[in-house]
Amino acid sequence: MTLIKEDVLNGRKLELYQQNSLPEWGYEKPQTDTFAIYYPKDYDPEKSYPLWVVFHSAGHDVYSTIECIKEEGNHDIYHVVDDAFGLILDCRANTQGTTDWWWGGASAQADLSDPEVIKKRSIETQPVEKRCIATVLDTMAKYPIDENRVYACGNSMGGSGSLGIALSRGDIFAGIKANVPAGVRHAADRCCLDLEAPEGFKIPDPPIVVDYSAQNDGWSDGHEVLYDGMNAKKYLLMGFWGAFGHANNHAQIAKYNDLIHSFDLFGVKKNEAYPAFTNASTNDPLPWPSDRDSKAAGQVNAFFRWEVIKDEENEFEITLRLINESDWQTRVELPKESTADVTMRRLQNFKPNDGDEIAWEYGDAKGNVTCKDGIFTVEKLAITQSGCILKFNK
């Protein structure tokens, strides 16, 4: 990579780099791309920082994304919190004769019979995806990044790209936040959310996903694939919707659904276990695919919170609870109780083998579950605002 410019943006250092393609990325012809590094506000080289990886929309490139960051309310998802590094990627510079556009995936409105689209639709990553991952890893090596706090984000096409590139890379990304992603096909194809997986196919425990989309946005077509697939695979999706169209301004979106930013994604760490909630009784009915005229706001899994207490070789404990009014001010009537299935992900030390029987306790309830394919699930736990400790023993 070559440093081509240094600047200051909002009182924070900004660096622009160019990179030449590497043979292992698989491009048919050599190309040069640009990316930007945005420093924390009060940068201290002795500290380590989270990394916010930004995937731009179809209306932007790396340069115009930087311009958005200058103005509050302009594509708020691009804005990097003060105490984090930002990595702004680009897929616009080389769209002719490559699959770079749409970050290597299929859009919500793509013709799935198009040969150019078909060649993107598998578990195999495209050159642009390899380039993005390599750039993330290079950034982590060059700058003081906390390797357990790397997050992907994007708007529209970039929302599709962040899901498509990061969901299968739970070995790198702690979480994903997608604003009105213009398609979920990319993620579904790479992670086999609705397709039969090839024999032996497996991805690392995935990042936690926060997705907020609008049922009256044509670019949200197919969103049921993400919701149904994540639930079936027992991956954690915190999903939000409302009739806010293809919006990118947090304040405007909050007029329709003010729960969206209630979950602190920066609190998620790659090296910490988390519970994947599925089949929750408090989930709202999805507007996709058949209720797109609905004006109702809704959510899936938005009310759950947790805290890991113990993650040891033979014991694991975690507190499960629901959010309350002291956590987040909202127009929504917060539930006092929700029933959900709970699957543990990203266990660090408590790692049973397939076939192992695991004893669990949750308040007065207890039982046994069997580990299968590296995971185990306790069904229909009643989770309340006051919280309760879920315990596992080998």
PLM segments and residue spans:
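Short beta-strand-to-loop junctions in surface cap/lid or active-site-entrance loops
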Residues: 33-48, 57-60, 64-76, 201-202
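A domain-start/cap signature at the N-terminus of enzymes
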Residues: 1-51, 228, 365-366, 372-375
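Gly/Ser-rich "nucleophile elbow"/oxyanion-hole loop immediately N-terminal to the catalytic nucleophile
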Residues: 46, 111-156, 167, 172
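Alpha/beta-hydrolase
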Residues: 53-55, 179
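Alpha/beta-hydrolase-fold serine-hydrolase catalytic core, especially in secreted/extracellular enzymes
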Residues: 5, 10, 23, 32, ...
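Primarily recognizes the serine-hydrolase "nucleophile elbow" in alpha/beta-hydrolase
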Residues: 147-197
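Active-site machinery of serine-nucleophile hydrolases
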Residues: 58-135
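The feature captures the conserved acid-bearing segment of alpha/beta-hydrolase catalytic domains
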Residues: 43, 175, 181-271
